[in-house]
Amino acid sequence: PNHIHDIFQNGLPADFRLIGATTRMPNEIPPAIRSRCLEVFFRELEKDELKTVAKTAADKIEKNISEEGLDLLTSYTRNGREAVNMIQIAAGMAVTENRKDITIEDIEWVIHSSQLTPKHEQKIGVEPQVGIVNGLAVYGPNSGSLLEIEVSVTAAQDKGSINITGIAEEESIGSQSKSIRRKSMAKGSVENVLTVLRTMGMKPSDYDIHINFPGGIPIDGPSAGIAMAAGIFSAIHKIPIDNTVAMTGEISLNGLVKPIGGVIPKIKAAKQSGAKKVIIPYENQQAILKQIDGIEIIAVKTFQEVLDEILVNPPTEQKPFHIEINKESV
């Protein structure tokens, strides 16, 4: 027909907008599609929001669930779909036994049968400690988590050593069709940390240093740089670190704090873990951060500023530390 021929020749006079939604990770989507799309990432639901979703799902099928049951359920769910699915399966058990209530035993059965793992919900320590520092990490598409880093230092018998546990030795980058392996950036940033400590007059080679990342969170990237440096400094000088402060930022060879990614989910994770302050790189300041209430956000340019914020009762008669920074690099 002529109208079909005209469409092939001249196109269709319309402006189309195709909207697609997916739960896939960004690196699982073909680059040819991503390059032609405007990507919009939705934040992860908070625990109270997941409770609301689960409670609404239970009300729709006329079943009751206790607050303790909601707490347990939301500890194992990461989105609304998972919460609704767990409610429906647990409600099926209640219907079979002619019960109006969804019990904790029902939810535990769903958890064990589905082999679910709890979400990582780290809380800050109860008091300042030497060598214990609160770092921040991002895992998954947009989930933040508090990262308690432990540092132990002992005098070396001969030449000192450094041992790092809890992080990947190597990273794989690229797509499913092509990827390369490289040394972990998190492990490589330790070398930057040691260089900065040497410029402060310290001798890391005199000590056996052990840095541990507990909790099983996959750490990648150099964003734990200032946290590792603070932990080593605290362990060597025996100065406690404020347990109510969390921090994130890359550290350069000159002692500067460089910007990192995922700053918003990291700040929210610090707030949820009970931290009162969070330290971020100066270059990560954004107007949207002013909308986050309940936590003080401190933007720093140098590692010296980090130490000024976190050390508890440092020696005042003579500071044993100082970083010489090239002013032109700031």
Regions found by a protein language model. Give the residues of each.
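AAA+/SF3 P-loop NTPase mechanochemical coupling elements
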Residues: P1-A21
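Amphipathic coiled-coil/heptad-repeat helices and related helical stalk/stem segments
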Residues: H3-H5, G69, V263
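Conserved beta-strand scaffold positions in the cores of enzyme catalytic domains, especially
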Residues: L18, E39-F41, I297-A299
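Conserved C-terminal "switch" segment of AAA+ ATPases
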Residues: P26-A32, E39-I104, T199-D206, I239-D242
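Conserved phosphate/pyrophosphate-binding and hydrolysis machinery centered on Walker-type P-loop NTPases
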Residues: R43, S66-E67, L73-A83, K100-I104, ...
